[in-house]
Swiss-Prot record:
Native source species: Clostridium perfringens (strain 13 / Type A)
Lineage, opening ranks: Bacteria, Bacillati, Bacillota, Clostridia, Eubacteriales
Tagged with keyword DNA-binding: yes
This protein's name: Uncharacterized HTH-type transcriptional regulator CPE0189
This protein's UniProt keywords: DNA-binding, Transcription, Transcription regulation
Residues of the SIS domain: 123-263
GO BP: any one term: carbohydrate derivative metabolic process
GO MF annotation, one: carbohydrate derivative binding
InterPro entries linked to this entry: Homeodomain-like_sf, HTH_RpiR, RpiR-like, RpiR-like_SIS, SIS_dom, SIS_dom_sf, WH-like_DNA-bd_sf
Amino acid sequence: MGILEQLENPKFKATKSEKTLIEYIKSDLDNIIYKSISIIAKESGVGEATITRFTKKLGFNGFQDFKVTLAKEISNKKNTSIINLHVHRDESVTETANKMLKSSINILEQTVKQIDLDLMCKCRDLIMNAKRVYFIGIGYSGIAATDINYKFMRIGFTTVPVTDSHTMVIMSSITNDDDVIVAISNSGTTKEVIKTVKQAKENGTKIITLTEDSDNPLRKLSDYELTYTSAETIFETGSISSKIPQIFLLDLLYTEVIKEMFSEAVEKKIKTTSAILND
């Protein structure tokens, strides 16, 4: 029996809070799979723990597992593509492009609204005072880590991109309290990244995390947590909905650093550009 069938089944025994959650899910099926557990909890008025227990009651390992199955059901029911459940197989390129544009604008607007200005400044100062900065991430988050590492390196920072688990293990064993790790993971559940951060914290290394706004294990390990709302489903791993806020927040952090060290940053940028052109 599918999720939707279970929710409609009169024999399904639900608590008062679970009934509230069921009504919320049924009223927002088109968008529920794009929302984090924290957003659902806030909008439905039901606690995150209740949501987790409810999904396990339905036979799932947790909220993410629940969303995977629900996404499949909705996809099959609406005959839509699993690449993006708002994109239909038979629509024109223009329609798809406009949907993606609108989605990108909405994501950026949500990201800006969530920014904690004081926290961003603290992250900026932490990086500026660090001896070394490690940007770590696996998969698509690793791409974001590599991109921002290159930018900081161009203005004179000693930075290291770490995007594979083996190197992470080595790196985390030798970091110290002069170092900063910026750990990037959309879900905040990437095991390799979590393991690395735990080890580095034992060495006194300061941790900045960048994850979606959910009750995830990685952000709980951070000294400073930067979060964003991601509309990414399990089928959209690496989609624009997670990459846009990641890149935007990292670029904002980078820009804030440049503003503080403007003349020096410009000088270093000129030197590195010259070195590249003369290579």
